[in-house]
Design a protein with these regions (language model features):
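Conserved phosphate- and dinucleotide-binding cores of soluble alpha/beta proteins
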Residues: 3-7, 11, 61-275
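An N-terminal, well-structured beta->alpha segment
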Residues: 1-25
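Short active-site oxyanion
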Residues: 25-28, 48-55, 100, 237
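Glycine-rich beta-strand-to-loop/alpha-helix junction loops that act as flexible
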Residues: 27-35, 39, 58
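Active-site histidine-anchored catalytic micro-motif
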Residues: 41, 45-53, 59-64, 68-69
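Flexible, charged surface loops at secondary-structure boundaries
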Residues: 20-24, 49, 82-83, 117-118
């Protein structure tokens, strides 16, 4: 089973790179997580000339992946002021039906958000299927809205910090997060009775003094933000999921259900759907 999952994650990465790595890119964002290891490997083995491409990491792990693959890293702060990333590849902890994501399990959420918002398009490669609604770290028992400083494990004493030396606070919520389409006059998604809509919650948390970034990636996609001539596209345009049965499921923004696009091995189209 574990081998099947790893094979599917690798296949998802290969499909994502094959379908979304642009011709002659200038800058490409590289996120973190187990699936992104395979994304970098797929880029390295693609045969594409990337000698003039700058790869922008979201954290220390990403930078090491880039360097170890023989690719050229460039720090986010070193980007020219007007430069956009042609594409950014990253993982996610949870993804809902509208491709809103929870990220930050690897403690890189601030840099991940900067990279996603600077990219023309954000492609998510994940190790699990889409869920109906974000559960806000639903592996924990809901405890209201009490924030908890994430504690280190055996390898690290004290609270977890980001690569920029900021504290990470996990805030479980009592109910799964609503989509905008779930909101009604009786359930506005503004926190009343513990029900939050994704974008309203992200905005409310961001307005708390001292909060630098929120691990909710929602709102417009990169193309939507560019079309509106605004900065801030952070929702992926597509998510590739490596499934336990060895298939790759693809979900695009605004798509009603995922398509099974590949099975590994070999990488061949199995079934697609049009909505």
């Amino acid at each position: 089973m574990a081998a099947d999952i790893e094979a599917a994650k690798k296949a998802a990465a290969i499909e994502a790179v094959r379908n979304h790595f642009p011709e002659n890119p200038r800058f490409v964002g590289i996120g973190s997580g187990t699936t992104i290891v395979y994304v970098v490997e797929a880029i390295k083995n693609s045969g594409i000339d990337v000698s003039r491409v700058g790869f922008v990491p979201t954290g220390y792990q990403s930078k090491q992946l880039i360097i170890n693959a023989g690719l050229v890293p460039i720090e986010f702060d070193a980007l020219p002021d007007s430069a956009m990333l042609d594409v950014a590849f990253d993982g996610a902890d949870e993804v809902d039906e509208d491709l809103n994501c929870i990220k930050g399990g690897g403690a890189c959420l601030y840099q991940e958000k900067l990279v996603a918002m600077r990219a023309k398009s954000f492609i998510c490669v994940a190790a699990r299927q889409v869920i109906q609604r974000l559960r806000m770290l639903g592996s924990r028992s809901p405890t209201g809205a009490t924030p908890v400083i994430r504690e280190g494990h055996m390898a690290k004493a004290g609270p977890i910090k980001t690569d920029q030396d900021f504290f990470i606070v996990d805030a479980p919520f009592p109910h799964p997060l609503l989509l905008s389409s779930d909101c009604t006059p009786e359930r506005l998604g503004n926190g009343e009775h513990g029900y939050w809509e994704v974008e309203q919650l992200a905005k409310a948390i961001k307005e708390i003094n001292g909060v630098l970034a929120v691990g909710l990636f929602c709102g417009p996609t990169g193309p939507e933000a560019l079309a509106a001539q605004v900065i801030g596209g952070q929702r992926p345009v597509a998510c590739y999921f490596g499934m336990a049965d060895g298939t790759v499921a693809l979900r695009r923004a605004r798509e009603k259900r995922p398509s099974i696009v590949a099975k590994y091995p070999p990488l061949i189209p199995v079934r697609t759907t049009e909505d």
